[in-house]
Amino acid sequence: MAKEFSRTRRIGQQLQQELAVVLQRDMKDPRIGFVTVNDVDVSRDLSYAKVFVTFFEEDKEVVQEKLNALIAAAPYIRTLVAGRMKLRVMPEIRFVYDSSLVEGMRMSNLVSQVINSDKAKQQQFGSVDDVTENDIDEADDTEGKA
């Protein structure tokens, strides 16, 4: 992996902050709604910036519509951000949906479900150490019939 230059990283951080402000305050497009800028990767030559965003929507179609609205507004957003940053050349902005937040929430929910299931089985059978495979199979069978 190539060495990351501190200037590229600093510009990425500043670009992330400025994009967050512009998207929150200056964008009036109702299709976009509330968007979070998670990360910005700037190319070494500063010609491109890949902007990772998330929305508080889980429906894939709605997320795609919002992402398309952002992509369509990218030149305008670039102009607004260029006015706020002191760069000779403003990177071309490319928006990418970051599903890591949604996946993290999904994984957290799955872990919570497993913990709750374990607690229910512990209450039903007593100590977890006393539970045998047959007890678990029987509990699964009775849950399936209910």
From Swiss-Prot:
Q: Name one Pfam family in it.
A: RBFA
- Keywords noted in UniProt: Cytoplasm, Ribosome biogenesis
In the record, biological process GO terms are: maturation of SSU-rRNA
Q: What GO MF terms are annotated?
A: ribosomal small subunit binding
The name of this protein is Ribosome-binding factor A
Could you tell me what this protein does?
A: One of several proteins that assist in the late maturation steps of the functional core of the 30S ribosomal subunit. Associates with free 30S ribosomal subunits (but not with 30S subunits that are part of 70S ribosomes or polysomes). Required for efficient processing of 16S rRNA. May interact with the 5'-terminal helix region of 16S rRNA.
Q: Which GO CC terms are listed, alphabetically?
A: cytosol
Q: Where in the cell is it found?
A: Cytoplasm
Q: Which organism is it from?
A: Shewanella sp. (strain MR-7)
Give a yes or no for keyword Cytoplasm in this entry. Answer: yes
Q: Where is the composition biased (Acidic residues)?
A: 130-146
The entry sums up its family as follows:
Belongs to the RbfA family.
User: What do we know about how this protein assembles, alone or with others?
Assistant: Monomer. Binds 30S ribosomal subunits, but not 50S ribosomal subunits or 70S ribosomes.
Species classification: Bacteria, Pseudomonadati, Pseudomonadota, Gammaproteobacteria, Alteromonadales
* Coiled coil residues, start to end: none
Please name the PROSITE patterns in this protein's record.
RBFA
Q: Gene for this protein?
A: rbfA
Matching HAMAP family, A to Z? Answer: RbfA (MF_00003)
The cross-references to InterPro entries, in alphabetical order and at most eight, read: KH_dom-like_a/b, RbfA, RbfA_dom_sf, Ribosome-bd_factorA_CS
Q: Where is the segment annotated Disordered?
A: 122-146
